[in-house]
Curated annotation (Swiss-Prot):
Belongs to the class-II aminoacyl-tRNA synthetase family. Type 1 subfamily. This is Aspartate--tRNA(Asp/Asn) ligase. GO terms for molecular function: aspartate-tRNA ligase activity; aspartate-tRNA(Asn) ligase activity; ATP binding; nucleic acid binding. ATP binds at R240, D241, E242, Q249, E508, G560, L561, D562, R563. It is found in: Cytoplasm. The gene is aspS. One of its GO terms (biological process) is aspartyl-tRNA aminoacylation. Residues 218-221 are annotated as: Aspartate.
Length: 629
């Protein structure tokens, strides 16, 4: 075995304690005696010398072993491999002028080794771990996650974890300075599913009953306000059993905030202050506050989404009136049925060739899911207008009217989709993002100015066709606008909520609302949602009871900490900013969770598996089950 053949290299660490990290030393440290400890990043044999790049969390230092300084250390250094753990005693000296590395903070110096101790050896890692980006291979993510302890040695991942730590500390200091109390809420709570599924925890002491891991501390933080604690904050783990994607994890962290007697303006001001503090501390950037605001309806109709990316200017336009009386049956039937024709002006793309337009049409139908794309090209030579419909089907004058309404000029392209709200606006919004990325208008996550936006005035409820009833747009504790209370029973989807989302570069990073603090209003909302009095008392009786005892007005916000770090780091995925994340299938390859448990454990919990026919437990579990029976 590799380990046994190299075991004789390992020695006791007889060196003094580490004097410096591998990122500390500079030219002014010339001549200083130092002790460094870390991992071998690379080893090079050159001109009778051994060069080792020694790495730790703080940086990289070049160490030079010479037979003239210490023959034994030189010979051992020649046997070092990547990821061996060593301790080096030596002296700082300047590098030769031709050897200076200006890209490395320690690149002006090297350490001439006087002694070497190998603290542990490493087998050949399954992938390259290196501070040198060019040596980092495109490794399969599942392999990296299966050996996350190695992956965590990569400097870019360590920088993300450090950034996360600094965000934690800045957040704690900010809320402490604003007189907030940090209160821990229970992790084992009652199951009150709303939207996503709960993760359930069976109770051994109460067979047949279950705790749930919190999807958020929503009800608890409201109860803290009823309890008079006035200002609450918690950086808290939350859990949702839902389908995953790049920006979702089954367990995630949020900055949870609640205040009594709060108005929307106070929540905005507090949150903007936190963002300004974070950007100043972590990015050395001054944010302009207050952030711009946009209603939900305006965001949907202008950008096709409730989380618009304002870093580029393409906007949607409702051009339904331009096609009135056109005789084009597709447009006429949709508009007559209350639908919309939505246009997107794309500057400078009026000369696109037929093949490029065919690919765009395919993308609209295959990827975006729209019924079709009607487009109008205004060639840059000013020759008129071209469209992908015959003039018999749709006379050119209607396309020209739409182009004029959206401000198109010679050389521009006008794209139109037809359908019903909100779907057609969402499809047009997806087309906007596609064009922004294809044309390089949308900056990468780690480039360009950040664009914050408050989206306000959400509907309190939306109609769920599958459920056949209204459902909460946010959650059932969101306060309706007082002017709309009389519409709650008759037309709940037209009731405006006192809710708001914070958006950054097209990502929702937080959401909150002013809460219902009146028992009667809360019961009325439950009733509209199809939750009768008995079910409401069973699921939320503790909160309903609390609202009877002088509950103060209150409101707050929850900010996604993982997503904030991801955007600050310019990372592609939440998995790049969490130490031990789950995969997109909800698994953790390193510890192999979720895993089967012994039948005895299930029996203790009064549980029995009823598996689908195509799922069988592994042999080790099946064998134990037979023995137990």
């Amino acid at each position: 075995m590799e380990r046994s053949s190299r075991a004789d290299l390992i020695s006791e660490d007889s060196h003094p304690a580490r004097t410096h990290t591998c990122g500390d030393l500079r030219a002014e440290d010339n001549g200083e005696a130092v002790v460094l400890k870390g991992w071998v990043d690379t080893r090079r044999d050159h001109g009778g010398l051994v060069f080792v790049d020694l790495r730790d969390r703080y940086g990289l230092t070049q160490v030079v072993f010479s037979p003239q300084d210490n023959q034994t250390a030189y010979e051992v250094a020649g046997q070092l491999r990547r990821e061996d753990v060593i301790s080096v005693q030596g002296t700082v000296r300047p590098r030769g002028e031709e050897a200076v590395n200006p890209d490395l903070p320690t690149g002006a110096i090297e350490v001439s080794a006087d002694d070497l101790a190998v603290l542990n050896t490493s087998e050949t890692p399954p992938f390259v771990v290196s501070a040198h980006e060019e040596r980092q291979m495109n490794t399969n993510e599942d392999l990296r996650l299966a050996h996350r302890y190695l992956d965590l040695r990569r400097p870019d991942l360590q920088e993300n974890i450090e950034l996360r730590h600094r965000l934690y500390q800045t957040t704690h200091r900010y809320f402490d300075a604003h007189d907030f109390l940090e209160v821990e809420t229970p992790v084992l709570m009652k199951s009150t599913p709303e939207g996503a599924r709960d993760f359930l925890v069976p109770s051994r002491l109460h067979p047949g009953r279950f705790y749930a891991l919190p999807q958020s501390p929503q009800t608890y933080k409201q109860l803290l306000m009823v309890g008079g604690l006035d200002r609450y904050v918690q950086i808290v783990k939350c859990f949702r059993d839902e389908d995953l994607r790049a920006d979702r994890q089954p367990e995630f962290t949020q900055i949870d905030v609640e205040m009594t007697f709060a108005t929307e303006e106070q929540v905005y001001e507090l949150t903007e202050g936190l963002m300004a503090d974070l950007w100043d501390t972590l990015e050395d950037t001054t944010l302009e506050t207050p952030f711009p605001r946009m209603t939900y309806d305006e965001a949907l109709r202008t950008y096709g989404t409730d989380k618009p990316d304002l870093r580029f200017d393409l906007e949607l336009h409702d051009v339904s009136d331009c096609f009135a009386g056109s005789g084009f049956r597709v447009f006429d039937s949709i508009v007559d049925d209350g639908g919309h024709i939505v246009a997107l002006r794309v500057p400078g793309e009026g000369d696109r060739g037929r093949a490029a337009m065919d690919r765009l049409e395919d993308h609209v139908t295959d990827e975006i899911g729209a019924a079709g794309l009607i487009y109008f090209q205004l060639p840059s030579d000013g020759s008129g207008i071209e469209q992908n419909l015959s003039s018999d089907a749709l006379p050119h004058e209607y396309g020209r009217a739409a182009a004029e309404q959206v401000g198109a000029e010679a050389g521009d392209l006008v794209l139109t989709l037809a359908g019903h709200s909100p779907t057609v606006f969402e499809q047009a919004g997806a087309l906007r993002l596609h064009m922004g990325e294809e044309l390089g208008l949308r900056p990468p996550a780690d480039e360009g100015d950040d664009a914050f936006l408050w989206v306000t005035d959400f509907p309190l409820m939306e109609y769920d066709e599958e459920a056949g009833r209204p459902v909460s747009m946010h959650h059932p504790f969101t306060a309706p606008h007082p002017d709309d209370l009389d519409r709650l029973d008759e037309d709940p989807t037209q009731v405006q909520a006192r809710a708001y989302d914070l958006v950054l570069n097209g990502n929702e990073i937080g959401g909150g609302s002013i809460r219902i603090h009146n028992h009667e209003t809360q019961m009325q909302v439950f009733d509209v949602l199809g939750i009768d009095e008995e079910e409401a008392q069973d699921r939320f009786g503790f909160l309903l009871d609390a609202l009877r005892y002088g509950a103060p007005p209150h409101g707050g916000i929850a900010l996604g900490l993982d997503r904030l770090v991801m955007l600050l780091a310019g990372a592609d995925s939440l998995r790049d900013v969490i130490a031990f994340p789950k995969t997109q299938s909800g698994k953790e390859p390193m510890v192999k969770s979720p895993d089967w448990v012994d039948p005895e454990q299930l029996e203790t919990l009064a549980l029995r598996l009823d598996l689908p026919p195509d799922v069988e437990p592994p042999a080790r579990i099946a064998q134990r089950k037979r023995l137990a029976s």
